[in-house]
Amino acid sequence: MISPAKINLGLEIPFKRLDGFHEIRSVFLKISWGDDIEIEPASNGVFELFSNNEIILEKRKLYDQVSERGDIKNNILYKTFIKARSLFPELPGVKIHLTKRISPAGGLGGGSTNAASLLNFLFSWRPFFTSDEMFVLAAEIGSDVPFFLGEGHAFVTGKGEILEEIEVHHGQGILALTPQVMNTSEMYSLLKKPLQESASQKNGNTLSKNLISILKNGDWSSLQGRLWNDFEPVAFQLHPELGVLKDKFLEFGSSYCSLTGSGSSMYGLVQGLEIQEELLQRLRQEFSNLTFVRFNF
């Protein structure tokens, strides 16, 4: 089954919370592209991972370092299994076959989506888990993990654990898998957001009626200027070539283009399959050193 990547439609970071996390506001979309993962119970009660690394060459080593070929104790799948097993010793062992395509340090939720896939598998052994217990455990593993437990898209606030499911029109896009490594913690620190109590700022914790309508109707060009990613100025200052890439996305036919997460992956949304194909070909011709993939949602 697919362990899907996500993209962010807008990512606002209004302030840093007293608990050390940053408050976020974003629309998270699951897309059709991602990792392939197969999980089965292991009778001996242990954790086994067998993975094929299909990540872009420049970032391939980042995954291998935490795979079964490196220090697996730093792998999010291993951490998820150990944490769940410590709470519920009755849980079986697992054998996981993973085809890894989602790059680390890309803003696509590659680790979080794998963790959620494993939690959903373990959840099938009821009554060991309730949905509330699984959600709490997911939030402890990673801020983006709760989103991947569900099936739909969501407006996400808090540190990533407050989810409001939303309706989004079917759409298509092109994803650029870029080689730049963006450390999430460093990117947040470069934003230099003020410290503020979570409860002190309520405005913006809901989507406007106008944005809800745009998302339902799929008018992606109307998102420009209404949804933005606060990390883009920092990312483009560190890596000006990402700003050039965004300009070309828009020049070549993308209706809306943005960095996803804290970077470095970038995507463009389009109005229809013909424009999607034309955009893909023009980007591949302009940036022959980069990897581009089609996706829909």
UniProtKB/Swiss-Prot annotation:
Pfam families: GHMP_kinases_C, GHMP_kinases_N. InterPro entries: GHMP_kinase_C_dom (IPR013750), GHMP_kinase_C_sf (IPR036554), GHMP_kinase_N_dom (IPR006204), IspE (IPR004424), Ribosomal_Su5_D2-typ_SF (IPR020568), Ribsml_uS5_D2-typ_fold_subgr (IPR014721). Its EC number is 2.7.1.148. Pathway: Isoprenoid biosynthesis; isopentenyl diphosphate biosynthesis via DXP pathway; isopentenyl diphosphate from 1-deoxy-D-xylulose 5-phosphate: step 3/6. GO terms for molecular function: 4-(cytidine 5'-diphospho)-2-C-methyl-D-erythritol kinase activity; ATP binding. The active site is at 6, 144. Keywords: ATP-binding, Isoprene biosynthesis, Kinase, Nucleotide-binding, Transferase. It catalyses: 4-CDP-2-C-methyl-D-erythritol + ATP = 4-CDP-2-C-methyl-D-erythritol 2-phosphate + ADP + H(+). One of its GO terms (biological process) is isopentenyl diphosphate biosynthetic process, methylerythritol 4-phosphate pathway. Catalyzes the phosphorylation of the position 2 hydroxy group of 4-diphosphocytidyl-2C-methyl-D-erythritol. Belongs to the GHMP kinase family. IspE subfamily. This is 4-diphosphocytidyl-2-C-methyl-D-erythritol kinase. The gene is ispE.
